Amino acid sequence: MITLLHIDTSARRTDNDVKEYNSISKSLAAHFMDKWITLNSKDKVIYRDLGLNPPDFISQDWIAAVFTPDEKQSEEQKSLLTLSDTLIDEVDQADIIVISSPMYNYGMPAVLKAWFDQVVRINKTFTFDLARGDFPIEPIMSGKKLILISSSGEFGFEIGGIREKMNYLAPHVETASKYLGVEEFYEIKSEYQEFADARHEESLSNAYRGVEELVKQLV
């Protein structure tokens, strides 16, 4: 049995009366999870919808608590870190992390950035040692896979694409996830949403097909 951590980040739901208002990234991620559980019914799923339940932004007091040794933390500091501890525990349990995310202003939604800020934490998910020279940070966890399921209004954000340099979503997620022990990164994406034309329909169909192919590849 393996554990999957499924994280949705869109501000949109998937049950709107108007179909066009539904979140594409959430719908694709739900399709991934449905296909996975159909083939692996005994696997454990941990679910978080950050769009509906956004994590707290970190603060100066939070940072101070993080850099205070556990045995010296006040009760107030321990309380400040309760959410972070919970989220890190979920990451620690996960073999596979599935993150669905729209591209907002060419990057990740604020709720996803807030989640990363809560979980990428010194002495919990990474260590820092200047004896390592110019690369002092190393992850504590290892062996995890991450699937980013994304949607965007425009297109061409892939390597070599016409908007490659405008893509601050996938590269950011991939880079930050390394400090959560992620060693394999996959992305499935739907593009052209704002154009609402045949290209979007084809991209969305390809994304659904890509979901099914990736599930078969990973099981």
Curated annotation (Swiss-Prot):
Its EC number is 1.6.5.-, 1.7.1.17. Keywords: Flavoprotein, FMN, NAD, Oxidoreductase. Homodimer. One of its GO terms (molecular function) is electron transfer activity. It catalyses: 2 a quinone + NADH + H(+) = 2 a 1,4-benzosemiquinone + NAD(+); N,N-dimethyl-1,4-phenylenediamine + anthranilate + 2 NAD(+) = 2-(4-dimethylaminophenyl)diazenylbenzoate + 2 NADH + 2 H(+). FMN binds at residues 10, 23-25. Quinone reductase that provides resistance to thiol-specific stress caused by electrophilic quinones. Also exhibits azoreductase activity. Catalyzes the reductive cleavage of the azo bond in aromatic azo compounds to the corresponding amines. This is FMN-dependent NADH:quinone oxidoreductase 2. The gene is azoR2. It comes from the Bacteria. Belongs to the azoreductase type 1 family. It comes from Colwellia psychrerythraea (strain 34H / ATCC BAA-681) (Vibrio psychroerythus). Binds 1 FMN per subunit. SUPFAM superfamilies: Flavoproteins. Its cofactor is FMN.
